[in-house]
Amino acid sequence: MEIIHKISTNKRLVTFIYFLSLVLYSQDNSKSDFYREDQFYFGSSYFIQTESIENFKQNGFSGNFQLGFIRDIPINSSSTNALGIGFGFERNYFTSNIQPTEKDNNLNYEIIVSRFLESKNKISFSSISIPIEYRWRKSTLSEYKFWRIYSGFKIKKNFPLYSNPSYGSELRIKDIEDWTTSIYLNAGYNTWNISLEYDLNPILKNKKISNQTDLNISFFRLGLIFYFL
């Protein structure tokens, strides 16, 4: 009886080890499909003013360039769906007929109607951005060229504007909103991707031009963004 008991115990032990090995194998096998798409990115966009401002004209090229890094957090076993959070830098500039002027340490804004002057009035500013996004891609562990759709929002810390007016010296504008947000959609194949972004806040703090029209400067951005592993 003792021998039979030992044989039975050994069988149970072998069976337990067998099933344990199957579980461990399946876990290792599932882990083999798990990967991250941590990426550096670089992009450039063209600005289109979204708010209607009387007599406002956008002249020349207005846009930005951006660069940064996205940390990938897969949310399914095949890693085709993920969340992303990143850190980036943006340099923005736009040319228009908005003319800031300084008098007694106060800044005033007006619309310049002269065709000659308006094309020379460039305003620029920089931002630190925190993109948070949902990421879908048609990729595998060994496939590096695939379709992707990344959509989310950005929180931006903005730094003072600088204006190169049509006449006079450069002006430092402190009226910029310190924090703004935007929503975006990036989609494409492999390295090349279309980038769409829409500002949810105006850039300037509750400013008006000389005729008391609200100076709500916000943009729709259309451009390209490139991802690198």
Task: Give the location of each predicted region.
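Bacterial Sec-dependent N-terminal signal peptides
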Residues: 1-34, 224, 228-229
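Short glycine/proline- and aromatic-enriched beta-strand/turn motifs that initiate or cap beta-hairpins
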Residues: 26-72, 225-229
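Short loop/turn motifs that connect adjacent beta-strands in outer-membrane beta-barrel proteins
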Residues: 28-38, 74-81, 139-147
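Predominantly the C-terminal beta-signal and adjacent terminal strand-loop region
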Residues: 31, 35, 49, 174-229
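Glycine- and aromatic-enriched membrane insertion/assembly motifs of diderm outer-membrane
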Residues: 48, 57-115
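Outer-membrane beta-barrel translocator domains and adjoining extracellular loop/strand segments
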Residues: 53-57, 95-102, 161-168, 205-211
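Outer-membrane beta-barrel transmembrane domain signature
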Residues: 73-75, 119-205
